[in-house]
Design a protein with these regions (language model features):
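Hydrophobic adenine-recognition pocket in adenosine-nucleotide-binding enzymes
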Residues: 107
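Helix-to-beta-strand junctions that scaffold the AdoMet/dcAdoMet cofactor pocket
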Residues: 112, 127-128
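Class I (Rossmann-like) S-adenosyl-L-methionine-dependent methyltransferase catalytic domain
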Residues: 1-97, 114-118, 122, 132-200
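A conserved beta-strand element that flanks and buttresses the S-adenosyl-L-methionine
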Residues: 103-104
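Conserved acidic residues
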Residues: 100
Length: 200
């Protein structure tokens, strides 16, 4: 997350962000993600934000690591989840064969589109064989700063183009949903579940 304005946004609006995300009911997508994983899978919440999803996975018996680029959100999520949330910028992430599942919910959409293939490749490398990743992006064709944060929006077509240089994933599911937060109107999200099927 190289865009300083995005991290500045979360620093200035920590409480508002937590209030609008931490108690949102996201269990349908959480459970769908878990259905692709073995029992007792080891998970990474990549860009955990308020800690909502980390806590859900822990409460359901999974071993979870969590990280975020915002120091302020790391503090909130650590207190909320009961585990130490690691402060790390996305570009500093470098793991290999460590996780059965990676949850990147509304996180890597803060990167530039040109940065996403490298980021997704590094997430691929962090997965064990047959591991699964969930990613979500705002739906559309926009790229740039909006409401104080940098966003890359994607559609099914632009996601497929983005993935062309990346090998070793099988697409399990890709679908569009509405925003589950209140007062978000017709805002839509692109949801993606991929499985690692080969080792690069």
């Amino acid at each position: 997350m190289r865009e300083n304005n995005t991290l500045d946004y979360y620093k200035l609006h920590t409480a508002d962000f937590v209030n609008t995300t931490q108690n949102v009911d996201f269990h349908e997508i959480q459970e769908l993600f878990l259905s692709f994983l073995p029992a007792k899978a080891k998970l990474l919440d990549f860009g955990c934000g308020s800690g909502r999803d980390t806590k859900y996975f822990i409460d359901n018996g999974y071993e979870v690591d969590a990280m975020d680029g915002s120091k302020e959100l790391c503090k909130v999520a650590t207190k909320y989840t009961g585990i130490k949330v690691q402060h790390m910028l996305f570009e500093d992430f470098n793991e290999c064969n460590a996780y059965d599942g990676i949850w990147a919910c509304a996180s890597i959409l803060h990167l530039k589109k040109c940065e996403l293939p490298d980021m997704i490749t590094r997430l691929y490398q962090a997965l064990k064989r047959n591991g699964v990743i969930y990613m979500s992006f705002k739906y559309g064709d926009f790229e740039g700063v909006r409401n104080g944060r940098y966003f890359t929006y994607l559609t099914e077509e632009s996601f497929d183009m983005l993935m062309k240089p990346i090998h070793g994933f099988m697409k399990e599911k890709i679908w569009v949903t509405g925003d589950v937060r209140q007062d978000r109107g017709t805002e839509q999200w692109l949801n993606i579940i991929l499985r690692k099927v080969t080792t690069i």
